[in-house]
Amino acid sequence: MEFLLFLVLLIINPVVLCGLLVLFFSYLRRIKNERKYFRTAINNDFFEGRYYIKNALKFGFLNSIITMLLGVELTKQWIFVYMGIMAVGIILSFYVDLNSILLLVFTGGTIGIASLSLFDEKMVIPASLQSFAEIKPGIIFLILTVFYLTKLSMLKSYKQDFFQPKIYNGKRGRRLIRYSLRDQTVLPLIVLVPGNLIHSLIPVWPILSLGGQSFTLFVLPLWISWTLKLWRNSVEMELQKAKADTQQKLVITIIGTILGLWFPITGIFVFIILLLLVGLRFVQRYAKMKRKGKWYAETHDGIRVVAVRPETPAAKMNLEIGDVIIMCNRIHVTTESEFYEALQKNSAYCKLKIRTYEGQLKLAESAIFADSPHEIGVVLFR
């Protein structure tokens, strides 16, 4: 019965529903843009929603075990303010991803308020902020640890199918492609809230008694999102850099959790280190955007692979975005029409000569079945 109530609370949680709704509208926008630029939807599947629910249940369950074992305690005022801020952030995520900024500002503010009373016990904290001052810095760092740990786990499942292409006009008349990945989920984290917050509304909801104090189990919706953009970098390199960056932040939050629980006064200093790392990575990324590199651009020495539709002959041949098809069935191709004509030379089999984004040559081949899509699933410049 209690487990069913947990599932009901997860499903009707407004933040979870808001995230799923925004993700659905983002899916509709993706399909619209793909049909606008390429006259076809690259992937009609609403995979965003499937991964949203899958990640929420899997990582929510695993991380809830951690929060329950460590007895994560949050005040109801903190939770409600957090839920309101994250709900606004999720709505705005249709246009801009503010997930990390909002979380760092909110958690940093909480650690700052808690640190005021730690540095000066005589300092009077306003009544409206008292519930924030009661939260230990180590608990806040634990939430950040769950945040970065989940982001790192989500990152490992990403592949080129998740990156969406968009066409831009270059300065020299060539058309360029920018790839972007946007993904999000909301984890249902079980935390402890002093008092009978839910029990007063749902009498059968369990209450825990620890140290002579009553606690209510509450599901905290932890919003987690990813936004990655590619201009002049390969998918593999971008994912590797994002992984290394997230691992560094994760290490800092783990250290902050340990020190914050045993030596709360150190929390503000560890958080400053985290902010410095975030700022440094932002500056480095901006500086890199100004450097020279290979664009995903239209070419006259073959045809550029803009995207690969899943479960097609092109996907079976392991074609990657940025590849340049030089030959098809031993015929040189430089335009879409030439590529299509070369495919007609052998309607049952296709053999390609390809130059990768890094400049290496490779061969790829695959059988073509009767139900294979036009142009074997390769999306080209139109």
How should these model regions be labeled?
Residues 112-235:
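Generic multipass alpha-helical transmembrane bundles of integral membrane proteins
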Residues 282-316:
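PDZ/PDZ-like groove recognition
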Residues 1-68:
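N-terminal signal-anchor module of multipass membrane proteins
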Residues 91-105, 230-240:
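Membrane-helix interface "capping/anchor" motifs
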Residues 314-336:
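Conserved PDZ fold ligand-binding element
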Residues 207, 225-288:
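Interdomain regulatory linker/hinge segments that flank or connect interaction modules
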Residues 11-26, 67-84, 135-145, 209-219:
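Structural signature of hydrophobic alpha-helical transmembrane segments
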Residues 338-382:
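PDZ-domain C-terminal substructure recognizer with occasional recognition of PDZ-binding tails
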